[in-house]
């Protein structure tokens, strides 16, 4: 995902104030979310996959809170993806907005043709 598209998604989230079947929001203000594995599994088993955006606090009116440490968060996301069978290979993107970092993990859908 390009930086421009990521920033557009952040703006869209502020307008819609909701998740969708292919978009999950996680706050990640102090650490990597504990229930990430379930979301990774769910998105990887959908035809279209999905996007997880970290740094949005949906419990606090979808406030753009940013993530605790973008580098460490990416490492922990990849570690959880490597534990899955089959292994999930996310495309990770980091953007900065209003001096806060946000991370997007694009999770590819399953390829049933294999």
Go through the PLM ranges and name each one:
Residues 1-114:
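Conserved N-terminal catalytic/coupling substructures associated with nucleotide/phosphate chemistry
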